[in-house]
């Protein structure tokens, strides 16, 4: 009997597909049934080969060998996943396999993962495509009933291939040119370099910012606060103190007369459903999670727990075909603290509107929402619970009625000067009930105060009990944190010099720099290359990063290049542009980049050289700040030796409660805090042991749980081991 080979992107998804398709016979790297054989990749199993596979001379990095423009680019099997590739290849080439179903992630990159494996395996069999947004049993069954012909995704594959090949030509040539020219480990790319430039420009804005003092006038009448307003501009700031003093003198001792009382009924709908970037922003703002951390948690909630839909989405809308499933989804997540809100939604027919249902605003995947699978909240760890909470509350909130209130504005005159007071009376909490008054989570950013305004009428006189001058200062832009950097990457129009409206529109339509799936990795790459560093929660460029921006060609620093690429890649995916035409342009562009770097008169200087010599090549080493602490790195790029000298731990300073760094080696290890506090590791362990003896069962259990969850080694191994052996008896 002929069979169908199903190729998933990851083992966890493959096992789910196998179970639903009744495949029970477990093989090495695959699961087989009567009709289907399910196997899987491990992400990419195949990639574009390094330059040396075209010519041995490319093993050495030399400026004179550039540009490298081999054609066609060859595929190679990734070494660490070669075993799984051979398993997949063998299954694909079985004589009883008549067709292949691509069941990798439904998107450009998922298409590339599968097509490269098929191409490298030299398989010529009919292809079908599974295109689903969640991996619940129901979604998988529906998806297999509606498999699409593989030829319908040929242009998507061409677009993915064009992107990968263009990144190879431009990225490898530019990186080698910079590295060879300046003998430093320098790298650039069409996404990471503009992102670095955006951070640098924000720093320049802050540096050049000159604060201005402004003044205002505040009048109080029987507890009512009235704010001065310019008659012409409606602004309440005065930048000229003499003008403010003059107004103040002219109205001192005078009462106010009400000239207008305006009441307006207002309603406000909940913020839209989450896409990945918005979720990463909120998780960073509320919990301090990095974008990569949030994506990793989301991936578990999608793949392992099957509670949320596909995470790598750039849409905040659902399609009309999802509407019929909403009741089931509300029932599935409506447990525990969500039961009250869910019950209220389910009492009546569910109402939808254009604020979250729009077919035109969904391309590959709809917004992140709960699946129809019931949740056991206790099965989630603390971090999973927090991310799940954000998604569920946002989902329930959009299904709730709007927040309704009456906005009231009192306008009064004191002599010839206008004063206003604003307030609101809540009519119905609506969707805000879901958040129980937690305004940090609901993200509503209310601009109308809750000041209770008195009942006054036009013509009434208000007795002014006090009138005073207020003073403030304009503030510079905030430095980027990971959340605000994601926003800038998503919408980088502000940083584009081009006046070309088409390009501005393209960068907006294509989601800015990078994709929802790659932005977290781009930020991590900038940390890993020591081009940016973290101070507190804020991100800053390093000296190396700033110098790199002085060295790279201007084109590579602007989001405009990405906009142009995405415009063409979009045309390829729609069948309007040939892939080879785009690649030829990229080869020409690579030549230009290399020539510009070769002819540059700029110099690169290591300004972080230490007195420590490299144990491998004896050259002086550089001190760099990585995301996890300080490192010593050999300045010679060909040597590549690196050593950690301190790392940021979870240990909190007893004085200021901030995370401390662990420095030194062996018995000389010492905790150091920015506030100046220092403590030897040995005395820290003793102190913690004493605290543990006094701790409650709950505290100790929590400590052990946190240690087990930590990705890095626990900062206090001896203590963690001792705690894990404790027999914690229940309190009577």
Predicted feature residues:
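Intrinsically disordered, low-complexity regulatory segments
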Residues: 1-164, 476
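Conserved short loop/turn motifs at secondary-structure junctions
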Residues: 1-3, 103-106, 183-185, 263-272, ...
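Basic, low-complexity terminal or inter-domain segments flanking catalytic cores
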Residues: 2-5, 27, 81, 92, ...
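Structured, non-catalytic alpha/beta "coupling" segments that mediate domain-domain communication
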Residues: 28-58, 193-239, 399-451
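C-terminal or mid-to-C-terminal helical accessory/interaction module adjacent to the motor/catalytic core
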Residues: 73, 115, 139-221, 264
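Metal- or metallocofactor-binding catalytic centers and their adjacent structured scaffolds
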Residues: 238-272, 280, 560
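Glycine-centered, phosphate/nucleic-acid-interacting loop/turn motifs that mediate DNA/RNA or nucleotide
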Residues: 305-306, 530
């Amino acid at each position: 009997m002929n069979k169908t080979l199903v190729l998933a992107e990851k083992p966890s998804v493959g096992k789910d597909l196998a179970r639903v398709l009744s495949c029970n016979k477990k093989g090495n790297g695959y699961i087989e049934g009567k009709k289907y054989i399910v196997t899987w990749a491990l992400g990419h199993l195949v990639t574009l080969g390094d330059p040396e596979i075209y010519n041995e001379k490319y093993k050495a990095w030399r400026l004179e060998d550039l540009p490298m423009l081999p054609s066609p680019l060859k595929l190679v099997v990734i070494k660490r996943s070669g075993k799984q590739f051979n398993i997949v290849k063998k299954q694909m080439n079985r004589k009883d396999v008549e067709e292949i179903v691509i069941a990798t992630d439904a998107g450009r990159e998922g298409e590339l993962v599968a097509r490269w494996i098929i191409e490298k395996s030299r398989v010529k069999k009919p292809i079908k495509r599974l295109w689903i947004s969640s991996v619940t049993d129901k979604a998988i069954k529906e998806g297999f009933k509606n498999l699409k012909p593989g030829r319908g995704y040929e242009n998507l594959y061409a677009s993915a291939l064009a992107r990968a090949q263009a990144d190879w030509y431009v990225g490898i040539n530019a990186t080698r040119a910079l590295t060879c020219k300046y003998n430093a480990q320098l790298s650039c790319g069409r996404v990471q370099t503009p992102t670095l430039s955006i951070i640098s420009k924000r720093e320049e804005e802050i540096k050049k910012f000159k604060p201005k003092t402004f003044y205002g006038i505040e009048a109080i009448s029987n507890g009512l606060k009235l704010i001065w307003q310019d008659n012409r501009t409606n602004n309440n700031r005065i930048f000229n103190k003499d003008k403010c003093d003059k107004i103040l003198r002219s109205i001192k001792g005078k009462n106010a007369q009400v000239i207008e009382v305006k009441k307006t009924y207002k309603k406000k709908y909940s913020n839209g459903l989450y896409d990945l970037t918005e979720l990463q922003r909120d998780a960073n703002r509320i919990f301090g999670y990095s974008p990569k951390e949030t994506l990793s948690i989301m991936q578990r909630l999608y793949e392992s727990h099957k509670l949320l839909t596909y995470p790598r989405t750039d849409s905040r809308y659902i399609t009309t075909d999802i509407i019929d499933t909403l009741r089931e989804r509300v029932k599935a997540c409506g447990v525990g603290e969500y039961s009250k809100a869910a019950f209220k939604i389910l009492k009546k027919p569910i109402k939808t509107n254009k604020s979250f249902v729009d077919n035109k605003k969904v391309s590959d995947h709809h917004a992140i929402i709960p699946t129809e699978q019931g949740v056991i909240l206790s099965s989630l760890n603390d971090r999973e619970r927090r991310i799940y909470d954000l998604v569920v509350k946002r989902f329930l909130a959009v299904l709730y009625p709007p927040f309704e209130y009456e906005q009231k504005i009192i306008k009064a005159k004191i002599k010839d000067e206008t004063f206003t007071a604003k307030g609101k009376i809540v009519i119905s909490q609506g969707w805000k009930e879901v958040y129980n008054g937690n305004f940090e989570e609901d993200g509503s950013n209310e601009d109308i105060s809750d000041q209770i305004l008195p009942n006054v009428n036009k013509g009434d006189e208000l007795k002014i009990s006090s009138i005073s001058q207020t003073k403030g200062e304009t503030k510079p832009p905030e430095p980027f944190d990971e959340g605000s950097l994601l926003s800038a990457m998503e919408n980088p129009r502000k940083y584009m010099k081009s006046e070309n409206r088409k390009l501005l529109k393209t960068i907006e339509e294509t989601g800015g720099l990078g994709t929802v799936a790659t932005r977290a990795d781009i930020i991590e790459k900038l940390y890993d290359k020591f081009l940016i560093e973290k101070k507190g929660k804020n991100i800053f460029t390093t000296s190396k990063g700033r110098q790199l921006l002085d060295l790279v060609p201007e084109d590579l620093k602007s989001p405009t290049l990405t906009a142009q690429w995405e415009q063409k890649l979009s045309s390829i995916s729609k069948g309007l542009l040939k892939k080879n035409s785009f690649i030829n342009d990229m080869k020409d562009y690579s030549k230009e980049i290399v020539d510009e770097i070769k002819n540059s008169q700029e110099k690169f200087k290591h300004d972080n050289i230490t007195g420590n010599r490299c144990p491998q090549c004896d050259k002086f080493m550089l001190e760099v700040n990585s995301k996890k602490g300080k490192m010593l790195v050999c300045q010679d790029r060909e040597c590549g030796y690196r050593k950690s000298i301190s790392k940021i731990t979870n240990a909190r300073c007893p004085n200021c409660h901030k995370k401390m760094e662990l420095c030194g080696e062996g018995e000389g290890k010492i905790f150091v805090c920015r506030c100046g506090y220092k403590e030897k590791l040995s005395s820290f362990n003793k102190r913690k042991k004493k605290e543990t003896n006094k701790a409650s069962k709950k505290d100790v259990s929590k400590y052990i749980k946190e240690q087990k969850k930590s990705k890095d080694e626990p900062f206090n191994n001896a203590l963690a081991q001792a705690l894990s052996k404790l027999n914690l008896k229940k309190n009577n």
